Amino acid sequence: VSLSLAGESEPDAAHLRRLAALAVRIRPALISEHLAWSAWNGHYFPDLLPFARTTEALHRIAANIGRAQDALGTAIAIENPSHYLRFDGHAWDEIDFLAELARRTGCTLLLDINNVHVSARNLGYSAEAWLDRFPQALVSEIHLAGHSQDPALGESLLIDSHDAPVAPEVWALYRRFIERAGARPTLIERDGNVPAFDALMHERSMAEATLREGTPTRQSRNASHPAPPPQIRTCGATAYGSCLGS
């Protein structure tokens, strides 16, 4: 939603007012934003730009999340972005940084599993190990999407392009998380090369099957707190349902 929460300046007040009015009108299930920045010195960049995860950045972003939540009248969800280059200057691990933001602000976390896979491949770490450390209780929604290879670098650089089917590796990570954490509302993103409607519904059916198959594992561990029923949405060029975020 272009809030640029990791930027050096506060979220644009006029934009927040317009977003709040839109939320009142359409009553979205969730409002989300990436852990990234996209505006500087009055200029907007149509991208999700990285930053150094320092303690100073933690204070600044927590304050910006608080401002956004106050303006919107609700907690928002913060999404893990995709990473393409190793960024110098980090003082915080990404998962610890996200968890601390949630602790300070009351926000929830939006887990984009395609971003997990893309980042792990690009930076050379284990997506499974990263996912297993993610704070399950803080996840309010999951995103699935397809990715592409960089035209010049090929498999050595994956792009979170939302223009392809969800990859087998991403489905495997999704099953891994659901088996451990239980069902979560899930959104499948598709913004380019949109296929026939039947193909989109097939992916929806795959996600629903994963949620159904994964849910009993959690229920067997904690029968007094059954998991919520599966919720699947698709969002993008063939959107239906309500979502604010990306």
Residue ranges of each PLM-predicted region?
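Glycine/small-residue-rich interface belts in oligomeric ring/scaffold proteins
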Residues: V1-L16
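Conserved, mostly hydrophobic/aromatic
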Residues: I31, D112, I142, T186
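Gly/Pro-rich active-site loop or hairpin
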Residues: S9-E10, L48-A52, L58, S119-A181
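Charged/polar low-complexity intrinsically disordered segments
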Residues: Q231-R233
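Active-site acidic/histidine proton-transfer and metal-coordination neighborhood
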Residues: D12-L109
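Active-site beta-loop-alpha junctions enriched in small/polar residues
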Residues: V1-S4, L35-A36, P81-H83, N114-V118, ...
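C-terminal helical cap(s) of enzyme catalytic domains, especially alpha/beta-barrels
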Residues: F197-P216
